[in-house]
């Protein structure tokens, strides 16, 4: 789901999402990170 991390590129979300979900699968959606 969405996490409270601002972004411009999906790769900016990989590390934050890995910390939250343990998975590096992420997308930047409407300038906010979404983890899968």
Curated annotation (Swiss-Prot):
GO terms for molecular function: ion channel inhibitor activity; potassium channel regulator activity; toxin activity. The record marks 36 as: Aromatic residue of the functional dyad. PROSITE patterns: SCORP_SHORT_TOXIN. It is found in: Secreted. Disulfide bonds join 7-28, 13-33, 17-35. One of its GO terms (cellular component) is extracellular region. Poorly competes with (125)I-kaliotoxin binding on rat brain synaptosome (IC(50)>100 nM). Is a poor Kv1.3/KCNA3 ligand. May have as real target KCa1.1/KCNMA1 channel. Shows weak toxicity on mice. Its main location: secreted. The record marks 27 as: Basic residue of the functional dyad. Expressed by the venom gland. Belongs to the short scorpion toxin superfamily. Potassium channel inhibitor family. Alpha-KTx 16 subfamily. This is Potassium channel toxin alpha-KTx 16.9. The lineage of its organism: Eukaryota, Metazoa, Ecdysozoa, Arthropoda, Chelicerata. Pfam families: Toxin_2 (PF00451). Has the structural arrangement of an alpha-helix connected to a beta-sheet by disulfide bonds (CSalpha/beta). InterPro entries: Scorpion_toxin-like_sf, Scorpion_toxinS_K_inh. Keywords: Calcium-activated potassium channel impairing toxin, Disulfide bond, Ion channel impairing toxin, Neurotoxin, Potassium channel impairing toxin, Secreted, Toxin.
């Amino acid at each position: 789901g969405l996490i409270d991390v601002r972004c411009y590129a999906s790769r900016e979300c990989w590390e934050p999402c890995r910390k939250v979900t343990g998975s590096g699968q992420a997308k930047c959606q409407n300038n906010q990170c979404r983890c899968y």
